[in-house]
Amino acid sequence: MAEARRRIVVTGGTSGIGLELVRRLADRHDILVAGRRADTDALPVLPEGVRYVHAPLTDPEAATQAIAEAMLKAGWVKLDNLVLNAGTGFAVEGGIESAAQIRETLAVNLTASVLLARALFPWLEKAGGTLTLVGSVAHTGQGLFPAYAASKAGLHGLARALRAEWSGRVAVQIVHPGPTRTEMHAKAGHDPGRLRDIFIPADRMAAMLEGAIAARRSPVTLSFGRYWTGRAAWSGKL
């Protein structure tokens, strides 16, 4: 018997880990991607059949409203998975980000996640669904990205709080990917140099992320060790 198609929202699904996750899921599930790109830029990179809503998380309230409206337009009355993957950051040497950079980082990485979790909880509860917060190993502290690290630490705390608050109604997990071969560092203004060669490829990180989501465990760190050795590589599928 074929598994039922799940209804899944993915933020930050037009590049990097998010896009690779969407590509893995699109043929088996109904996907709504939310992102900052215009429709004309986003739709060509997404698999056929994936819905898209232009919802830049730099304005968390407007983005939350746009995503909820897109779900209603699609006729969704419940939500199986909410994957809050979108993230941004700025690299600085010997200091801390500017006020504008701090506001943008916290808006995209933390405030939007809080608002989306609150707004979409009723959809998740109807499905007995899962909220997945995509953090980072940087949540333990990252010198070049202090506000980014703080925002990911905030997500870790949010996951713990919601996991207790929503117990028995909605599963909540935090997943912390390790260094991944995406455009993130370049966009942040940081060149990792030759270290980039040992970063985990985005498609392999997405495979581990899918497995972690399917397992519903929390917290989960998707590390070099798991990738290179294959140990507990989170190879399950949604």
PLM regions: where:
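Rossmann-fold cofactor-recognition segment
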Residues: 46-61
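Active-site helix of classical SDR
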Residues: 117, 151
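Residue(s) in the substrate-gating loop at a strand-loop-helix junction
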Residues: 136
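Conserved NAD(P)H cofactor-binding loop of Rossmann-fold oxidoreductase domains
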Residues: 85-91
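Substrate-binding pocket helix/loop in short-chain dehydrogenase/reductase
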Residues: 93-106
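Conserved glycine-rich cofactor-binding loop
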Residues: 14-15
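C-terminal helical subdomain
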Residues: 174-175, 190-232
